[in-house]
Amino acid sequence: MPEADSSVLQIWGGHPLRGHVKISGAKNSALVIMAGALLCSGDCRIRNVPLLADVERMGEVISALGVRLTRQADIIDINASEIKTSKAPYELVTQLRASFFAIGAILARLGVAQMPLPGGCAIGARPVDLHVRGLQAMGAEVQIEHGICNAYVPGSGGRLKGAKIYLDTPSVGATETLMMAATLADGETILENAAREPEVVDLANFCKAMGANIQGAGTSTITIVGVPKLHSVDYSIIPDRIEAGTFLVAGAITRSEITLSSVVPDHLIPLIAKLRDIGVTIIEESPDCLRILPAEILKATDIDTLPHPGFPTDMQAPFMALLTLAEGDSIINESVFENRLRHASELNRLGADIRVKGNTAFVRGVPILSGAPVIGTDLRASAALVIAGLAAEGKTTIQGLHHLDRGYDQIDVKLQQLGAKILRVREEPANAEVAANNNASPAPIST
């Protein structure tokens, strides 16, 4: 894993991309499926796991519970036959929001769990009240004190009980947490207004492969009938739809022809529809392969982010970068998370014309972007800056790579292989702006 705290990305824009890129496994599947492996007392082999800082950190959380975990290439093996402690480490969980979701699996296995409140990207309030109320409905006693969530199941058996749970919002994390908890509960659990994201379906399929009884994943009503025990599994996670979308947008903004493999087109329907709206041609070459063709003119469009199957909030920032060069005025309404438009000011540093009011961004297309030093403020914002840098004239230097490395598997290497002039350079932060003002062309990049 690159040491992003002392590195910057330098991008010399204006070069078309060409070639093929293989999409890695889904970050948001990998994290929750690793947590789901705690439900099983046998061996779990998880394939197609991306190389990410978040995955590495999740592995550290699981190992800290006393669980055996090994990794080789894109395969992770987990044996949770013995979970030695129910207390997750504060310093790790507070850095990774998804690690909190393991509370459902730990509570289901042990009848007790102690989990610090989560961390991750600072993109607005993402409370855990839905998780807590759902676990309480299943019979758990839950208290939050001093930033620690303490949960236990009263009684000698320590087994959660099935319940009918309505989620006020279709929270992905709450749906996944409660689905995991319900797999080993006594009786039937029904989750109403459940999240429908592909990663929720992937977790359900993983649990079903271990012997769980889950019906309705991918719809707003999920029914889980608890079983006494789950068995070993060998499972491959789905491709990352957000990484795929990011490369499609990178191809669109650079007017390039590239091919993406290891994709699920059905997971990209809203994004592909918007790309076609603005004039981009997307061809489904095969059931797991897409090709993007360059558009002569990019047209403005409006976007409202929504829970799946709507336009994904994780693609809002990358698509905003694309719309900075579209002809006309676009409106982007971020309705899923608050405080998720901070990348607009950084895009404006590159010459974009974006005005933000509340959770809405008004984007007026400009003829060109110009390279400048910028800082990624969160994971998807960093991706947006990479995309803009690929199209900008001159040199763009991006700081804050620890965000990017949380969610993209070697994105700079993959872009190099497509012909982008992009380099990861280790340097002290104080020198980054000085380096950014040096507009010399890079040495040829070996691919």
From Swiss-Prot:
Keywords, ordered alphabetically: Cell cycle, Cell division, Cell shape, Cell wall biogenesis/degradation, Cytoplasm, Peptidoglycan synthesis, Pyruvate, Transferase
Is Transferase a UniProt keyword of this protein?
yes
Q: Which residues form the active site?
A: 121
Location in the cell: Cytoplasm
Where is this protein primarily located?
cytoplasm
Q: Does the keyword Protein transport apply?
A: no
What is a single molecular function from GO for this protein? UDP-N-acetylglucosamine 1-carboxyvinyltransferase activity
The residues that the entry says bind phosphoenolpyruvate are 27-28
Here the disulfide bonds are none
Q: Which InterPro entries match?
A: Enolpyruvate_Tfrase_dom, Enolpyruvate_Tfrase_sf, MurA_subfamily, RNA3'P_cycl/enolpyr_Trfase_a/b, UDP_GlcNAc_COvinyl_MurA
- Transmembrane stretches in the record are none
Specify which residues bind UDP-N-acetyl-alpha-D-glucosamine according to the UniProt entry for this protein: 97, 126-130, 314, 336
Identify the GO cellular component terms for this protein: cytoplasm
Q: What class of enzyme is it?
A: transferase
EC number(s) recorded for this UniProt protein: 2.5.1.7
Q: In which pathway does it act?
A: Cell wall biogenesis; peptidoglycan biosynthesis
| Signal sequence interval, chain numbering | none
The record's catalysed reaction(s) read: phosphoenolpyruvate + UDP-N-acetyl-alpha-D-glucosamine = UDP-N-acetyl-3-O-(1-carboxyvinyl)-alpha-D-glucosamine + phosphate
| 2-(S-cysteinyl)pyruvic acid O-phosphothioketal modified-residue sites | 121
Superkingdom per UniProt: Bacteria
Q: What does this protein do?
A: Cell wall formation. Adds enolpyruvyl to UDP-N-acetylglucosamine.
- Please report which protein family the annotation says this sequence is part of: Belongs to the EPSP synthase family. MurA subfamily.
Question: What protein does this entry describe?
Answer: UDP-N-acetylglucosamine 1-carboxyvinyltransferase
